[in-house]
Every structure is written in C-alpha cells, then in structure tokens.
C-alpha cells in the first residue's frame, strides 16, 4: 500500500473499465504523438536517401516514406500497448527516494506505537493506579539513572533508589498543597511545631535499574494508626512497564522542640485525610517487630562511624538514607561481591546528630527463605543505645525475580473504588 501510494504520484493509474483513447496518429496516445519537422541540410553535409526495401510496417502501423514527409495508416490488426520514450519516464532516483522516505516514516510510526503499547499506564493496572490518578491522589515522576548513581555492579545503589523515593514523596506533598513551611508540613503542623519522622521502611527489589534506564515512580499516602501516615511506592521501567521495586513506609509526628512523638491534632488530621487512599500496602506488613540480638554474637562489627555535616537533613538529624549505608558497612565483603540485596526492612528507633559515634553490627540469621540468605543488623551508639534495627535478604547476583503485585481493591477517602 505504501509503495503503491508513492508510485501513483509518478504514474497515474486509469480508472477501472477505461482504456486510453487513441490520438490523432492512430494508436499512439495524444501525449505521445510524434511530430516531425524537415531539417535543412547544410552545404557540404551528407544527404541520406530512404532505402526502398525498408520494412513496410513499424510498431504495427504502415509507413510510406516519401520525400520530406511521413504518412501513417491505421493497421486493422491488434496493436501492442503503447511504449513510452526514455526521456519521458520519471527520474528513478527521485522515485526510489520517495519510496524509501515513506517506508522509513512508516517504520518510525510503528516503533512509536509499539513503545506506547508498553507504557506502564497502558498495561494491566493491578493496583488500581489509573483510578487513583484520576482522583489526583497519586504523584508520578520519572528519573533517569545517572553514571554517578550506580555502584560496582553497574546498577543503581539502594541509597540512590531511596533518595528517589524520598524525592517523589516531597514532590507529592507539594502537589497536594502540603508544602507550607518545610518538607510536607501542613499549616496545622507548623502551628503545633510538628515534623514528620520515618519510623519503618520496607523495600523489595525485583530488579535493579542500570545506568541510562528511565524509571517511573508512583507514590500515594494512606493513614497509619493514630499518630502517622503511610507512603507506598512502585518503581517501574518506563520502556517495558516492568515493576522493578516495591516499597512502603510509616511516618510519625514528632514535636520539633521536645523531640518526642505526638498524636495527630484534629486540625492536622482534617488537613491530611482528604489525601489518603484506602488501599492495601504494596508490601504486606506482618506487624512483627524486629528481634534484638546480642551484639557479642555478631559476625561482623564496624566501629567508629561518625556523621558528617552533609549527612544531616533539613530537620538537623542524620538522613534516613545514611543509616542504610552504615548498615551495609558491616556486611562481609564476600557477600557484597557474590550476592545482591533483594529485601530490606528497617525500624528507626532514635535520631542521631553530628556528635554521635556509632557502630554497625551484622549477624547471620539461620532461618532461610527460598534459598536466600538472611542477616540481622543493629546500628547503635557507643553507649549501647539502639538507633536502627534491620533485617535484609540476599540472593545470588543476576537472579532477579519477576515479582508480581496481587490484584487488590482499594477505596479513596471519599469512597471511590480504585480497583
């Protein structure tokens, strides 16, 4: 079809059931009727005389050659199709260029359609994101993985991914109008000197993105108990729609002056509730606290960890992402070289500042989960005060799983179904 459209511009196609009409010169089309004019022969030139034994017919027409004139008589026999002269044919290079251009344009169009068909928002919506997006309760952002965000394995580090999760949460607060004076603080929170602190984080990694990949992150809020809220994230590959990472977190209110946890005041709850989604978390929470282990039984200990100025966040305490880096400091090097982190659960117990000196302890968990190795972690101050407890799961490298999120039915705070 594409080639026919291209060639029709050069060769007009007659309508069905019609045939070309002969011109005045017999079967020749009028556009191809030959016209001969006698030319004068200059002095000294050769004069050519027609051979009397010339063939009486040429191209199906009787030809009588006389001095200076050409007469044709219509041949009653069947005539072959008219022929076109070479100088009347189109420029073949132009024709080939036109055909090539059409094919290239068609190929690009099909490529674009094929990529659009793989976009995450056109795949099966297993958690009802489309409906939540229509309600304006989901924030969606895209990030490209930079060269300085990858590690020795040429994949994005867990710290990079957590920074992107935090960035989408802050942008989500801004889009909802909750960015009053500080990161995610509502007017009621500012009035009561309240700030958000992260108390628990869960991450499950199906596959780590690599340098140059573009990922899309969807995040939304939901209520969590009486003193906080939960935040969920889905990280997917922009090109294929594959879900790479799932994460969920719990945030609590803390008084900025007393540094103690606080319940949500009524006015703050009224500000937040319209933006909550009544939906199951993307990672099921078993509500079991991480068990404490004896530091003396630890398999690996890293001491003398001290925060730097750049490790502090806007609330003047160490960023929650920095704790993850400290936890991994005590992992055995042979594990880091042969395995990759696929599951992470972190409980934040206390904050620490510039003057803190910490130690990171790691112990092997004897229990197994599908052949994956498990470890328990403890980050504490030198005086023995617990700062962070964690549990991690590791799998052999290049053994990523295609985790799927079960279909769930959710409702927004105004009662709309999002399944």
UniProtKB/Swiss-Prot annotation:
GO molecular function annotation: acyl carrier activity; fatty acyl-[ACP] hydrolase activity
GO cellular component, one term: chloroplast
Enzyme class: hydrolase
Residue numbers annotated as active site: 315, 317, 352
Presence of keyword Plastid: yes
Catalytic activity: octanoyl-[ACP] + H2O = octanoate + holo-[ACP] + H(+); decanoyl-[ACP] + H2O = decanoate + holo-[ACP] + H(+)
Residue ranges, compositional bias (Polar residues): 61-78, 399-419
EC number: 3.1.2.-
Signal peptide as annotated in the record: none
Entry's localization field: Plastid, Chloroplast
Keyword set, alphabetical order: Chloroplast, Fatty acid biosynthesis, Fatty acid metabolism, Hydrolase, Lipid biosynthesis, Lipid metabolism, Plastid, Transit peptide
Transit peptide endpoints, chain numbering: 1-50
Keyword Transcription regulation applies: no
Mutagenesis / variant outcome for changing residue 351 to A: Reduces thioesterase activity 18-fold
Matches recorded under InterPro entries: Acyl-ACP-thioesterase_N, Acyl-ACP_TE_C, Acyl-ACP_thioesterase_NHD, FATA/B, HotDog_dom_sf
Major localization listed first in the record, in broad terms: plastid
Top-level division of the source organism's lineage: Eukaryota
Outcome recorded upon mutating residue 351 to D: Reduces thioesterase activity 9-fold
Family designation: Belongs to the acyl-ACP thioesterase family.
PANTHER family in alphabetical order: OLEOYL-ACYL CARRIER PROTEIN THIOESTERASE 1, CHLOROPLASTIC (PTHR31727), PALMITOYL-ACYL CARRIER PROTEIN THIOESTERASE, CHLOROPLASTIC (PTHR31727:SF2)
Role: Plays an essential role in chain termination during de novo fatty acid synthesis. Possesses thioesterase activity for short chain acyl-ACPs. Substrate preference is 8:0 > 10:0.
Protein name as it appears in the record: Acyl-[acyl-carrier-protein] hydrolase FATB1, chloroplastic
Lineage: Eukaryota, Viridiplantae, Streptophyta, Embryophyta, Tracheophyta
Gene name tied to this protein: FATB1
């Amino acid at each position: 079809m594409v080639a026919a459209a291209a060639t029709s511009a050069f060769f007009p196609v007659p309508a069905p059931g019609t045939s070309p009409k002969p011109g005045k010169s017999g079967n020749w089309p009028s556009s191809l009727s030959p016209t001969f004019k006698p030319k004068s022969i200059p002095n000294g030139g050769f004069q050519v005389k027609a051979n009397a034994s010339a063939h009486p017919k040429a191209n199906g027409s009787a030809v009588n050659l006389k001095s200076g004139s050409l007469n044709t008589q219509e041949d009653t026999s069947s005539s072959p199709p008219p022929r076109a002269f070479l100088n009347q044919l189109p420029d073949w290079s132009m024709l080939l260029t036109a055909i090539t251009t059409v094919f290239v344009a068609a190929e690009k169009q099909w490529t674009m359609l094929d990529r659009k068909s793989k976009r995450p928002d056109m795949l099966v919506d297993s958690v009802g994101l489309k409906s939540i997006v229509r309600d304006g309760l989901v924030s969606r952002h895209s990030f490209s993985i930079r060269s300085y965000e990858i590690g020795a394995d040429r994949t994005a580090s867990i710290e990079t991914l957590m920074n992107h999760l935090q960035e989408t949460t802050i942008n989500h607060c801004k889009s909802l109008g909750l960015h009053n004076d500080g990161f995610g603080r509502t007017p009621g929170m500012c009035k009561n000197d309240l700030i958000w602190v992260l108390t628990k984080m869960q991450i499950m990694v199906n596959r780590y993105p690599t340098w140059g990949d573009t990922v899309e992150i969807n995040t939304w809020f939901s209520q969590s108990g009486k003193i906080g809220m939960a935040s969920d994230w889905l990280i997917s590959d922009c090109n294929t729609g594959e879900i790479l990472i799932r994460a969920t977190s719990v945030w609590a209110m803390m008084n900025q002056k007393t540094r103690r946890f606080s319940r949500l005041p009524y006015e703050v709850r009224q500000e937040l509730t319209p933006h909550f989604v009544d939906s199951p978390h993307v990672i099921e929470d078993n509500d079991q606290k991480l068990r404490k282990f004896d530091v003396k039984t630890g398999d690996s200990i890293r001491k003398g960890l001290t925060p730097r100025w750049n490790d502090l966040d806007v609330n003047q305490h160490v960023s929650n992402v920095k704790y993850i880096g400290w936890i991994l400091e005590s992992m055995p090097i042979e594990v880091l070289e042969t395995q990759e982190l696929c599951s992470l659960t972190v409980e934040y117990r206390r904050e620490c500042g510039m003057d803190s000196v910490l130690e990171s302890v790691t112990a092997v968990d004897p229990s197994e989960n599908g052949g994956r190795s498990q470890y328990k972690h403890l980050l504490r101050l030198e005086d023995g005060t617990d700062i962070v407890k964690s549990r991690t799961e590791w799998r052999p490298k290049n053994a990523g799983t295609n985790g799927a999120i079960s279909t769930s039915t959710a409702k927004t705070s105004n009662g709309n179904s999002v399944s």
